[in-house]
Amino acid sequence: MAVTNNVLAWNREDTPVGRPFRPESLAAARAESDAGHDLPRVGGRLWCWPPVRMPETRDSRQPMTRDVAARGARIRYVEAGDGPPLVLVHDYLSSHVAWDDVVPRLSERFRVIAPDLPGFGESEKPPPSRYRYDFEAFSESLVDLCAAVGLVRVSLCGHAMGGSVALTLAATQAHLVDKLVLVNPLVYPPRPDTLSRIAGLPIVGPFIFKQLFGRALFRSRFLPRVRGGNSAPARRVDHLFELFDAPAAREAAYATMRAMLDTRPLTASIPRITTPTLVAWGRANRACPVEHGRRLARELGGARFEVFDCGPSPAEECPAAFAAVVTAFLTGGTGN
């Protein structure tokens, strides 16, 4: 603080704009004071304008949406909370909205980051000639994301295809992963569904997938997690279809589906996983039965195994129970 002609004024570093008291501002200053702002006074008189106000504070648990460049593609992600970093990786044809019911719970203990993988959600959808759309490419994008937001070591939670991406990252970048949560990951060949059968058709498969894959078939893929009287997942499915129903998105989804059909690299990577791991499964998962989860936990060297009374998406079907189990594992138990 400096004294000039018996009038006190802020030094430049003490005020947001570095301007001393100006007589013509007195009326405005009085209006601010009358409005209830706590302005500096000397001898009952105002002595500084503009007033210095404390910056507004924000609840860190309130999700914020940001963009970052990763492997040459723009990635949209949602961030909420403080604490140890936790990265949530969504399933095929999904996005960060799949975690909407658990982010408020998890952000009470963790700094949660939920990205849209390239080609999905609100992230950029580069052509397959520029982006590979396989588990390894997605995991490399997550490495870039972590570096861009200043994360040196994280816990990873991946659902279905996202679990496969998380598994790949833990196998190739073990130094980056603190703990691993695999939710119904695609590791062993699943029971074929309509979508994978279409994608595997020669010649006509790409045309059907990119041109004729409509809302009804899209919704049928998510039907198990829509049931149960919860309308929120149903609204999310419609939102996801709107994001999918564009040429670039369909091209990316088709390339990803083709890569997902071969799970042999994932199975081969299991012995390289040394990260403490929780394997979570939905008891009513028809595409990947619970026996797949038990086998994976066993082959990971005795990872913790948790079964939920739901279908393929515990985070959407039983979010409170899922968040509690994940929080307990990440803050306490070590898994394998």
Predicted region positions:
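Conserved HGGG/HGGXW glycine-rich cap/lid loop of the alpha/beta-hydrolase fold
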Residues: A73-K125
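Acidic catalytic loop of the alpha/beta-hydrolase fold
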Residues: R283-C288
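Active-site loop/oxyanion-hole signature of alpha/beta-hydrolase fold enzymes
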Residues: V68-G72, V78-A80, A114-C157, A324
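Catalytic histidine-centered segment of alpha/beta-hydrolase-like enzymes
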Residues: G311-A323
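Conserved alpha/beta-hydrolase catalytic His-Asp/Glu region
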Residues: P192-D193, Q211-R272
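Short beta-strand/loop motif that positions the catalytic acidic residue
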Residues: I273, V279-W281
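Flexible "cap/lid" loop of the alpha/beta hydrolase fold
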Residues: A171, D178-K210
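Alpha/beta-hydrolase fold catalytic core
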Residues: M1, N6-W10, V17-L86, S107-F110, ...
